[in-house]
Amino acid sequence: MRIRSLRLINFKNLEDSTIEFKGKNISGIYGPNGTGKTSVIEAIDLLKLYFEIERPKNKNFLETEREKIKSLISKGKESLKIILEIEIKENIYLIELELGLNKFNDIMILKEGIQIKSTKSRSVYKRLIELENNISLPQPKIYLYEKNKKEIQDYFLEIQKDIFNENNTSLQEIILKLNNFNSFISIFVSEVKKIVKNNKQIKDKYLEINKRCIEILISFYNINVISLKEQALSNLEIVMPINFNIEIAQGTIPICCKNNPRNSYGEEELNIIKKVIENVNKLFPLLTQGAILECEEEILTKTEEGVKYSIKITVKRPNKEAIDIYHESTGMIKLFMLLSALMNILQRTDAILLVDEIDVHIFEYLLAYLLEILSNHSRGQLIFTAHNLLPLEKLNRDSIILTSFKDDKVTYEYFKGKISSSTNLRLKYLKAQYLWSEDNIQPLVIKESKVESTIRELQKNV
C-alpha cells in the first residue's frame, strides 16, 4: 500500500497544489515556513477521519471537530477539495472529497468520489461509486460505473430500495449520518453487512463495490498520524499516544501520566501496552546508550466487569534508578512515540505513517541515521515534514520533496537534472537558497540589510 499523489484545492493557503510521492518507502517534505508542509499531513488526516470505521460519528463528535474542519477551508472560499491517489495491492484508487459550508454555516459533504484502475500500464480510471450532494437536493445522488459514459444515472433510489429498506434504515437516518461526517462508503459497507448477516439476497454489483470499499476503509485505518497536537499533549504530560500492531489488534492507545484520572486500563489494554514496550525495547536501548523502557502497574479497581489498572512507564538506564518517562526529556518521550509507530512500517507493507515535524526534539544525527535505516529496510511508507536539513545527506533524490512559493502559489518540487550518487543534496539545496541555482526551487529571499536596520531601530527605541 502506498500513497502516490495528493491534490489540494482551497485548502488553507493552498489554492490548487499537487504533490507526487516518488519515494519508494520514504518521502520527506522540506521548505520554508508557510509553504504547505503541514497541510499535506492535515489533509490526509482529515480523509482518515472522514473514512474512519473504528467508531460511528455523531453530533457530539462533530461539535468538537466543526471549527477545526471549517478553518481548513481557504479564507473567502466556499469549499475545499482533497484528491488522493493511493495504491492498494493490484489496484490504484482516486479518492475525492469536497466539503463546504451550508447556509447554516455547518459542514456539508458536497462530493465523495471513488475511481479505480489497475496498476497495469495504460489502464484508465473508471468510477466505482460517487456521491453528489447540495442543500437543494431532497437526498444525495449516487453514481456508479456506466459503460456508456454519456448515460449518467442516479442510483440512490435503487440502493435505498435494495439495501436500506431491506434493513429498515430510513432516509432520515442516512442523511443524519452523512451530516455527522460519516462517509457514504462506510454507511454502504455497514448496510451491506447487515444484508449478508441476515442471509438476504443482494446484487453482485453491490458485493463487488462493497469489496472495494472495504479495501479503502481498511487502508485508511492502516494510516497512522503523529501530529504536532499529539506531540504537544505529550510534552504537557497530558497524554502520550502510542501505536500498536500485534497479533490480536492494532490502533492507538493514549498513555496518561500517573496522576491523570484517565490513567485506567483494562487487562487487554495493559497487555497491549506491555507488548508495545517489549517491541520498542528491541531498538530503544540501541539508540539511547542502553536505556530500556519498563511498565509498572497498580490495581485501581476490581469488579465483576474486570480489573482496572493504573500504569507508569519508566526509563531505566544501566546502573541507575528507573524514572517516570514524563520526568525524562521531551526527546525521549518523542523517541518512544516515534518508535512505537515505526514498528508498523518496518514490519508491514500495508502500513503508512505520517509525522509532522519529525525533527522536533530528536538529535539530528540520530534522526539522519534512523531515516537512512528506514529508507533501506522499511516495508511500509513514511511521509514526514521537517526543517533540519542533515537527513538530506542520507536520503535519495526521490525521497526529498521541496516546497516553495512560485507566482504566489505553493509548489512541491524535486531536484531536476542528472545527480551523481556522490552529490550532497543538503549542500545542493542550500546553494539553491543562496544562489538560485535550481530553476524550479524558489529561494527564501531575506532582505538582510532591512532586517539589520530594523533591529537597530528597535534597540534605539528602548
Task: Identify the residue ranges that each predicted region occupies.
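Switch/communication elements of ASCE P-loop NTPase nucleotide-binding domains
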Residues: 1-54, 276, 305-451, 457-460
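Short, well-ordered strand-loop elements centered on a beta-strand within folded domains, enriched
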Residues: 3-4, 93-122, 140-142, 301-316, ...
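A structural detector for beta-sheet-dominated domains
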Residues: 9, 22, 85-87, 98-100, ...
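Conserved P-loop NTP-binding catalytic core
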Residues: 22, 42-104
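Hydrophobic, Leu/Ile/Phe/Ala-enriched alpha-helical segments that form helix-helix packing faces
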Residues: 44, 48-51, 86, 99-101, ...
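Electropositive, glycine-dotted interaction segments
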Residues: 100-286
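C-terminal intrinsically disordered extensions
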Residues: 120-142, 439-462
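Extended helical coiled-coil dimerization/tether regions that scaffold
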Residues: 250-327, 444-450, 454-462
